[in-house]
Amino acid sequence: MNPNTKIIFVTGGVVSSLGKGVTAASLATLLESRGLNVTMMKLDPYINVDPGTMSPLQHGEVFVTEDGAETDLDLGHYERFIRNKMTQASNFTTGKVYQSVLRRERKGDYLGATIQVIPHITDEIKRRVCEGIAEDVDVAIVEIGGTVGDIESQPFLEAIRQLRIELGRNRTLFVHLTLLPYIRVAGELKTKPTQHSVKELRGIGIQADVLVCRCEKRFDDSEKRKIALFTNVDQDCIFTAEDVDTIYEVPLRYNQQGFDAKLVELLNLNTKEADLSEWQNVVNTIRSTKGEVTIAMVGKYVSLTEAYKSLNEALYNAGYKNGVKVKIKFVDSEEVNDTNVESFFNDADAILVPGGFGSRGVEGKIASIKYARENQIPFLGICLGMQLAVVEYARNVLGIQDAHSSELNPSTTNPVIGLITEWQAEDGTIHQRTHDSDLGGTMRLGGYRCVLKAGSRAREIYQADEVIERHRHRYEVNNNYVDRLEDAGLIFSGRSEDNKLMELIEIPEHKWFIACQAHPEFTSTPRYGHKLFESYIHAAVEKSNK
């Protein structure tokens, strides 16, 4: 880390899900708009090494970085808000910290010392924070997961308390996000939860420099004075995080309050004025959308929409680019079968089957894919969605009735989808896996190059000979079936550089039927969108207009 780099630590109190990630990303956006080089980091207090093996229903989406890290979904917010890409160093957990410390203890690196939370765990946290910030970064924004008062968060809070002492006040800043509930019956905003949250933080040894109060509406100076009096935070360092129609409006609201100007002042930064014209254009585009299309998303994690966070945002972004609002109809794949399939999609303008793991709800997804294929409904399959599209085609077009994935049915005699046992990474490294390999961190992860077939719809959409998209999978199309599938009309329009892995499929005779092994949603942003999703939504708009 450069000795001139500033660090802003963002903590949260009272309750979870206040929007720490969006607040942190918005602050990064504001500083970036002033010409600064900004990066971000998320520290997660849970003991899992990473979220890769956690249920999406518990944790939400697993966001994959370009260099192959399985991370918290907040990193998706970060990449949608700022231009810098996140890396392996941008997210670490309690589990990863302990794993590193214990590995060094086994090697004897601590020379027989008794390993303790302080100093060994806190030192490892500090090391990862400082070494994870590149030399050319002006400001790093570090979000601490969890809520102040949680026992799991204490080592992280102690570590950043120590960093404040070691780096100095001129290089560090504490921003604390709290809840300011509005009691409708009394018609009052209540400041007591905020007071207690700041007091809890002070008990750990951290005095907040800036307070961000999440509430339904902006509060006046009388509430600010009261909060300032009881929290030891200057009145002009207290800001409102009010509810907005779209999260992409948050940077604009903070800028209107002078939030970024205050950060620049407190950190003694020399910057130009903020240029938020791109974000104003994004918000104006969102507000000016006319019409609506309905996308039926068929999955098994639909009870928690955060499980598909980046995918949802990619669809919304593509809608904005097409001038329409996207309504996502979540369909539980376990409820769909060949008999009732039509009832789920009679109001849908397009169908999407996202990624997932395990056999639960698979036949419902296959029935949905068949319905889209046979009824000329625009279809997009992602990861498992592509694999099941191949299974469906093999069963119902090639007539291979027991075609399946060896992941979902190990005893199938026609495994059109099988385990990838070997592949080459972008850096030339050869990876090998078996059915007995650990689940955690053993998939084909990160950005991989895909060569697009000349004359294909995919090449027309991307307007490129090859693209890099991010992957997270361990099963792939079985190459023994590729020729038969292509002879029957299924085109493999994208392949890995070595031609061994099938990356994209399409049906030329269909109005819009494309599926990809990668996760293109991870690179969609509100400013730039994503060509594949934009084309998909355009097809949905055309169907809607008929």
Curated annotation (Swiss-Prot):
UTP binds at residues 16, 190-195, 226. This is CTP synthase. Catalyzes the ATP-dependent amination of UTP to CTP with either L-glutamine or ammonia as the source of nitrogen. Regulates intracellular CTP levels through interactions with the four ribonucleotide triphosphates. It comes from the Bacteria. CTPSs have evolved a hybrid strategy for distinguishing between UTP and CTP. The overlapping regions of the product feedback inhibitory and substrate sites recognize a common feature in both compounds, the triphosphate moiety. To differentiate isosteric substrate and product pyrimidine rings, an additional pocket far from the expected kinase/ligase catalytic site, specifically recognizes the cytosine and ribose portions of the product inhibitor. One of its GO terms (biological process) is pyrimidine nucleobase biosynthetic process. ATP binds at residues 17-22, 74. Its EC number is 6.3.4.2. The active site is at residues 383, 519, 521. Keywords: ATP-binding, Glutamine amidotransferase, Ligase, Magnesium, Metal-binding, Nucleotide-binding, Pyrimidine biosynthesis. Pathway: Pyrimidine metabolism; CTP biosynthesis via de novo pathway; CTP from UDP: step 2/2. Allosterically activated by GTP, when glutamine is the substrate; GTP has no effect on the reaction when ammonia is the substrate. The allosteric effector GTP functions by stabilizing the protein conformation that binds the tetrahedral intermediate(s) formed during glutamine hydrolysis. Inhibited by the product CTP, via allosteric rather than competitive inhibition. It comes from Francisella philomiragia subsp. philomiragia (strain ATCC 25017 / CCUG 19701 / FSC 153 / O#319-036). One of its GO terms (cellular component) is cytosol. InterPro entries: Class_I_gatase-like, CTP_synthase, CTP_synthase_N, GATASE, GATase1_CTP_Synthase, P-loop_NTPase. Homotetramer. Mg(2+) binds at residues 74, 143. Belongs to the CTP synthase family. Residues 294-546 form the Glutamine amidotransferase type-1 domain.
